[in-house]
């Protein structure tokens, strides 16, 4: 589980139902299906969420991979390699580039890589279109399950990214989005289930959709 869970709500307007849902979660009260203002608790997921929602949050890494594969197919990214306009997430801080673990970006260009085992992307902050794009070098293993991740010597001086359509609640800490879909896997976290769910709900500024598992 994450080392730190936020316990103060500060992103939402005071009358936003997100606060009500987050408070229920923090107090370990089970959430009920229904509509809460612009927010929703449901028992099924609609793939249109990858068009309509800013960020999907899950609990398990395996679920994250499945969701990202579904998102890419739904959005018609048919290549096994990352393409222009795809959303990616930083997996490791890089002080030289000024990027941090959990930051999300969009691929805006495909460049010639230094070796066939790497991708070279031009990327831009996911929600700041005015920011200048910069280049990154990423080993293919971070996007391709058929390629093993090499040792640190091979990765030295390069960056680490993965697809960002769905990310774990752990990776979401410190970030915020206008709309969030939470695929509720809080059961994975045992006694900390309510803290995980609270953290995910409070990543949303304006609207949250929670998909309750059966």
Give a label for each model feature.
Residues 1-132:
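Conserved helicase motor core of P-loop NTPases
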Residues 121-214:
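C-terminal accessory regions
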């Amino acid at each position: 589980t994450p080392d730190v869970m936020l316990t103060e709500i500060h992103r939402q307007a005071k009358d936003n139902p997100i606060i009500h849902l987050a408070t229920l979660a923090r107090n370990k009260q089970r959430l009920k299906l229904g509509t809460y203002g612009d927010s929703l608790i449901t028992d099924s997921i609609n793939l249109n969420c990858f068009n309509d929602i800013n960020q999907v949050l899950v609990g398990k890494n395996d679920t994250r991979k499945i969701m990202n594969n579904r998102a890419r197919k739904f959005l018609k990214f048919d290549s096994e390699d990352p393409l222009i306009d795809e959303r990616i997430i930083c997996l490791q801080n890089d002080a030289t580039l000024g990027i941090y673990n959990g930051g999300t970006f969009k691929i805006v260009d495909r460049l010639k890589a230094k070796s066939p085992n790497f991708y070279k992307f031009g990327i831009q902050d996911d929600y700041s279109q005015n920011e200048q794009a910069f280049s990154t070098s990423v080993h293919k293993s971070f996007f391709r399950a058929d390629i093993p991740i090499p040792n640190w010597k091979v990765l030295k001086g390069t960056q680490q990214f993965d697809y960002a359509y769905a990310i774990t609640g752990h990776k979401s800490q410190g970030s915020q989005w206008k709309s969030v879909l939470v695929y509720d896997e809080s059961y994975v976290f045992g006694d900390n289930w309510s803290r995980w769910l609270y953290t995910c709900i409070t990543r949303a500024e304006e609207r949250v959709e929670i998909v309750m598992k059966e």
